[in-house]
């Protein structure tokens, strides 16, 4: 008897879970069309301006993504060039440090 009651209660609960979300949806699609009157020209222009701004922002984001992915002067540690490329990168970094005024090497005395 307890099994049958539990089964019946679970079936009713399952049916309610299916019915409640379906009743929340509108019966007729409105498509954002107002039947009570004409649209104001200011509203239409405002909507078109917002749409234009969104399109411009999307284009800027696409260009920004392309600029980031195709960056030629990105930090390159030689990892993508193999072992010899990594050695060459270390050599070039050493040359750059040697050419730097405060870089490694023997400190020269000032000639006074």
UniProtKB/Swiss-Prot annotation:
GO terms for cellular component: extracellular space. Keywords: Amidation, Cleavage on pair of basic residues, Hormone, Neuropeptide, Secreted, Signal. It is found in: Secreted. Belongs to the diuretic hormone class 2 family. The modification Proline amide is found at residue 104. InterPro entries: DH2-like (IPR034439). The keyword Signal applies. GO terms for biological process: body fluid secretion; neuropeptide signaling pathway. GO terms for molecular function: diuretic hormone activity; G protein-coupled receptor binding. The keyword Glycosyltransferase does not apply. The lineage of its organism: Eukaryota, Metazoa, Ecdysozoa, Arthropoda, Hexapoda. This is Diuretic hormone class 2. Expressed in corpora cardiaca (CC), corpora allata (CA), antennal lobe (AL) and gnathal ganglion (GNG) (at protein level). Expression in CC, CA and AL detected in most animals, expression in GNG in few animals (at protein level). It comes from Agrotis ipsilon (Black cutworm moth).
């Amino acid at each position: 008897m307890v099994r049958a009651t539990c089964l019946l209660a679970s079936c009713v609960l399952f049916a309610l879970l299916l019915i409640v979300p379906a009743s929340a949806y509108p019966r007729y699609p409105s498509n954002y069309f107002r039947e009570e009157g004409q649209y104001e020209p200011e509203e239409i222009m405002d909507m078109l301006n917002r749409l234009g701004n969104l399109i411009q922002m999307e284009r800027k984001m696409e260009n920004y993504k392309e600029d980031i992915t195709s960056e030629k002067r990105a930090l390159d540690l030689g990892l993508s060039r193999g072992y010899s490329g990594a050695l060459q990168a270390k050599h070039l970094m050493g040359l750059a440090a040697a050419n730097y005024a405060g870089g490694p090497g023997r400190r020269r005395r000032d000639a006074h």
